[in-house]
């Protein structure tokens, strides 16, 4: 990638750091994890949770959401100014599950946001520790990516539901900063920009006045983030066009959708980080492990090792399959919703199935669901091998992919060829090559036509044994190419509703 040198590594984004060396980065990421762990331990004490209840992923999600809501300044301000009945803007809470007389009970807890902020800061040596908050947001985002297929959102902005492999991070809040921007897929950025342009078309004052100036600079910033994700000159030039447009409108929306489609073959670079639930970090910290001292990385072996030694439980609805629930969470932990399933099966050591074949709904339990028949079971989050997370889209080739999802966005830096349905993708590029961007469009289409099926991505990269911490012996996996490679094949994944 041309601009590799100018970019900060993710760990630097993750920790708002200046240029740091590897050891400093590992220490500052470790410090962030320590803070989340200490906070989680304290919350379990406040809520009087048993060890088992503290390792329940549903309780972890509630506690994470409480602290994220306590620090959501814009929303807090909005709630104070627009009071709604029955909602106290100063309080936050959610369902906490406890085991009472041999059955699971739901208890709704409510805390002062001020109190939650105090506990969080205390766990983080008095800092606001924004990096830790962003880390939890990314974990929630990865879980959403694995659980839901954003069909409706794609269709609403004029994109194709089969482009779901570009939608990583589509549910991340706007306030997730540089670390959040790094993990957003091409489709997510395009969707945010299209929404913005549509508002400008409908609202004459959107780009005008004092506010309009801020809006404009946000628009240009988002264009630049998207440009930085593209790896070819023509795609980048197209983003310059969109950014410099005097009055963004339908022509820009067309160009954006074109560039998103092109990313199915000419993939963008999207960061991947293994962000684990707080209930994994808490017990590790309370067992005396010092993440800051030992150092930690979100993109290497560390999350795999941590999951090998963690016990996490989940509530299971009456007709759900615990093994399927485990797969869902395992994929979320490794930010692997859009990775090739054959590679995931190899790394995990058990077959990873497409979303539509899983008998499991989301991890969160709705407040109106009946608790009477709820069981709980251990989530199997261990792996057979580990692999390095990638930040590049790999290079492109073609191979049969599925009806539901026609491309992948690689998570792991491992040698393979990347599947995409070339005929399907190319069919979308008929006709329209006139207008200002015609030469770029022609160039992009030419590159896509040239993508060869036999090309291999991440050449020489492999997976590693869990005992191989220094990554000295890469094992290059061999795949059964007749197998299905896409997770959102067909598609019976539920919709994500805000």
From Swiss-Prot:
Pfam families: Flu_NP. Late in virus-infected cells, may be cleaved from a 56-kDa protein to a 53-kDa protein by a cellular caspase. This cleavage might be a marker for the onset of apoptosis in infected cells or have a specific function in virus host interaction. Residues 8-21 have a biased composition (Basic and acidic residues). A motif (Unconventional nuclear localization signal) lies at residues 1-18. The keyword Transferase does not apply. One of its GO terms (cellular component) is host cell. GO terms for molecular function: RNA binding; structural molecule activity. One of its GO terms (biological process) is viral penetration into host nucleus. Belongs to the influenza viruses nucleoprotein family. Homomultimerizes to form the nucleocapsid. May bind host exportin-1/XPO1. Binds to viral genomic RNA. Protein-RNA contacts are mediated by a combination of electrostatic interactions between positively charged residues and the phosphate backbone and planar interactions between aromatic side chains and bases. This is Nucleoprotein. It comes from Influenza A virus (strain A/Kitakyushu/159/1993 H3N2). The gene is NP.
